[in-house]
Amino acid sequence: MIDRYKHQQLQIGSVSPQQISAWANKILPNGEIVGEVTKPYTFHYKTNKPEKDGLFCERIFGPIKSGICACGNYRVIGAEKEDPKFCEQCGVEFIDSRIRRYQMGYIKLACPVTHVWYLKRLPSYIANLLDKPLKELEGLVYCDFSFARPIAKKPTFLRLRGLFEYEIQSWKYSIPLFFTTQGFDTFRNREISTGAGAIREQLADLDLRIVIDNSSVEWKDLGDEGSTGNEWEDRKIGRRKDFLVRRMELAKHFIRTNVEPERMVLCLLPVLPPELRPIIQIDGGKLMSSDINELYRRVIYRNNTLTDLLKTSRSTPGELVMCQEKLVQEAVDTLLDNGIRGQPMRDGHNKVYKSFSDVIEGKEGRFRETLLGKRVDYSGRSVIVVGPSLSLHRCGLPREIAIELFQTFVIRGLIRQHLASNIGIAKSKIREKEPIVWEILQEVMQGHPVLLNRAPTLHRLGIQAFQPVLVEGRAICLHPLVCKGFNADFDGDQMAVHVPLSLEAQAEARLLMFSHMNLLSPAIGDPISVPTQDMLIGLYVLTMGNRRGIFVNRYNPCNRRNYQNKTVDNNNYKHTKEKKPYFLSSYDALGAYQQKRINLHSPLWLRWRLDQRVIGSREVPIEVQYESLGTYQEIYGHYLIVRSVKKEILCIYIRTTVGHISFYREIEESVQGFCRAYSYGT
């Protein structure tokens, strides 16, 4: 459908019978209305032409060949002549054959049929609205029992029998035996109700606003009662309150969308266009047909049988009519969702038929494979890997992908700079991978964002914009902080990259879709750009330090047992003899690490600014080391204090590693950058 802003969109919901007939009905020049499929046939076995009023009828769904009717007559499509648009003999419209991809038909059901999605899928919408158990409604739909109509102060057959509303199940087989078809119809229309028609009547009698009011009052009453002291009763009340909330939300949805609840019961069954359920002839003259055709045939056969029982047969017992209505209901259930009621229907080769639900759901369904999974131009796909040196808003594109995505822009750049006289020469330069090509590609990519998408796109953050940079290799590099929004990890996941072409799309990508603009979850507002998986492991490795500690002696808890037992191996003895380095600043420590004088986890002493928390601490030093000049060092668990002869604090050293220093500096620079940006903004 197309809305008032001329946006194409797809809307899924229940449809009225009038809308279904409007989709299919066509009026011929002689006044005949076509659109109803009444015969279960497909093609004639001799002529290989579609059967009239069948599942592939050309009058209903359009011609197989453009501009050629079933008689073989030809008309020019779109010619402004006074020739009739319909063939006078066969009634086929002279139109493009592509109409068979969207022209629908319908089957007029002899009895109402419930839509199995609304009845059997959990939660059951019909059971929620009617506030009745699902098992009871199933028995009513499949004609296992009936209920009495409320007829006040009138003599009825049921009153003579002394029956009440839910006692008719025992009369399931006895009541229909007393009546022929006409008599049973009269009795049923007046006194009892069964099948999907009973559900339709109850849904039509519902006042949704009264349903909301009654449910709200009951919910408040249950809330005012408080706890009963019985755990089982409290759970029962809690489940009832949850049910009432779902019922109110469902009723509000029907009111908001202006949908009548009785639409959940079908009177007209839509028939899909023939091109969506084709019959194909393969080698050897054999035919391959879609399973949906066989399921439609099953529905039409049973529906026609029920129509004959109701119209032509005068002596058919009412029990047979009820059984046939049940068969029609089961056939429609199988068409919509095969196997939802138990054992699925199978063909002669014991293969399960693919119903309408099987066609549209899943990874290979109509939506995900055909509609959402289309191949588009200016797009690529590759495996994602970690880009540790990337900023949050950047992604690394392999040269092979980037040159293909931005090839047209590079060609334009080569021609504008007079490096190529035409498109052919520009393409040859790109194929030869000349150095000037990569320079122009860099210029093009600087001002052009790209979109990264990871399927399935379940929420808004499944597609985000990034500033691309060229990287070596064949994998897309990604900052690990954006993985949570994509629900991605680096174990072989693939992502698609798209190039926004129009200026509007590029502006939208920059203003709304850049990764650094989507730091919070749109659903709950919590931070979504948080360290996960690989990044947490990296932070752990960076800050785990050395288990031996800065002192390998009796003061270290890790080695106290070894000291007591006097069993120190050679490796520990070597560390004991090593003197731990002292550094005046973090720059000196990082420089020593880059020169490979120390390791990432090597313990060291780093001079630190005077901290009042350290100065005022009451912690007892582990060891005190005196020097020849009178100064001494008080060694604690995680720091040491250098004091003068007069016991004044000269300086403080903390025990740390290069990994801790790197982590601290990254956080410090980030906080300072945020503060500067905030001060500029204010």
Curated annotation (Swiss-Prot):
What's its catalytic activity? Answer: RNA(n) + a ribonucleoside 5'-triphosphate = RNA(n+1) + diphosphate
Task: List the EC numbers from the record.
Answer: 2.7.7.6
What biological-process terms (Gene Ontology) are attached?
DNA-templated transcription
Q: Which domain of life is it from?
A: Eukaryota
Where is this chain's protein located in or outside the cell?
Plastid, Chloroplast
Where is this protein chiefly located?
plastid
Keywords attached to this entry: Chloroplast, DNA-directed RNA polymerase, Magnesium, Metal-binding, Nucleotidyltransferase, Plastid, Transcription, Transferase, Zinc
Under InterPro entries, the record lists:
DNA-dir_RpoC_beta_prime (IPR045867), RNA_pol_asu (IPR000722), RNA_pol_N (IPR006592), RNA_pol_Rpb1_1 (IPR007080), RNA_pol_Rpb1_3_sf (IPR042102), RNA_pol_Rpb1_clamp_domain (IPR044893), RNApol_RpoC1 (IPR034678)
Q: Can you tell me which residues bind Zn(2+)?
A: C69, C71, C87, C90
Tell me which cofactor or cofactors this protein depends on: Mg(2+); Zn(2+)
Residues the record lists as binding Mg(2+): D489, D491, D493
For whether the record's keyword set contains Mitochondrion, the answer is: no
Q: How is the cofactor bound?
A: Binds 1 Mg(2+) ion per subunit.
Q: How does it assemble?
A: In plastids the minimal PEP RNA polymerase catalytic core is composed of four subunits: alpha, beta, beta', and beta''. When a (nuclear-encoded) sigma factor is associated with the core the holoenzyme is formed, which can initiate transcription.
Q: Which family does it belong to?
A: Belongs to the RNA polymerase beta' chain family. RpoC1 subfamily.
Main function: DNA-dependent RNA polymerase catalyzes the transcription of DNA into RNA using the four ribonucleoside triphosphates as substrates.
Q: What is this protein called?
A: DNA-directed RNA polymerase subunit beta'
- Which gene carries the instructions for this protein? rpoC1
